[in-house]
């Protein structure tokens, strides 16, 4: 028995169960607005239940998990937490749509050194916003208060999503062939990738996040939420013979496009077919970043690259524009020689 007669509690160790319960009460409304008819029960159980939609004959489940990287540090520095949850959902669901999957449900993990209920509620509200945009249900999550693991009220988030696609409709890149057209679907900014380089550029250049650029502050440009493509992409998939979709995330063009290309093919991109959004021009100038490195780190204004038959490209672009997307023909698929790079940007 310790010489100290005072009784210790979990709260004395830095874990506030009451704060956790208060957070659950705060987020119930946000969770409710994401509900889908397939969801069984509410939050708070040991597991979350979800039926498969009855319209699928041979349903295939598609799963994904992701985070938002060091964009979180920027959100913490700017004390703005209500959109980072949208980023989290986007990074997960956009990875599902590349295989043609409709997102069904989403779960989140929120870890912090000291739970601030207001901050966590803002994050979860953003997650709910993202789920509404994606059409998936927020069915559960975990909040972990871990004193000594994180500095103060710093936090990290991770997301987990499951979607469904008809077995015969899985998009896996096997149909990609020379002569296919490539369509770009525009991004909303850097999305959630390249933020370690972005923060280094801010540090080295001494740039002020409150500096104005095209009517918005640099900070606002950089915290712009990742675009969620689910509803527009599902309509495109329904109407057109989509051969492959690449989500341009970490690794940029060079790493992500080859992931969906069969051996012996390459993507030939017309670098003059679009103008980089101003935030990318600013980052390149302030950081003196080479163009190749820009394409390797950032999406440079392109969130998705879609391969489809050439004779369907114009109609697909028109459909995407009707759905509010910025879309254009960005290139084509060509034959590649052995050991040749699978992405060529002219």
Curated annotation (Swiss-Prot):
Keywords: ATP-binding, Cytoplasm, Ligase, Nucleotide-binding, Purine biosynthesis. Its main location: cytoplasm. Pathway: Purine metabolism; IMP biosynthesis via de novo pathway; 5-amino-1-(5-phospho-D-ribosyl)imidazole from N(2)-formyl-N(1)-(5-phospho-D-ribosyl)glycinamide: step 2/2. One of its GO terms (biological process) is adenine biosynthetic process. GO terms for cellular component: cytosol. HAMAP family: AIRS. NCBIfam families: purM (TIGR00878). This is Phosphoribosylformylglycinamidine cyclo-ligase. It comes from Vibrio parahaemolyticus serotype O3:K6 (strain RIMD 2210633).
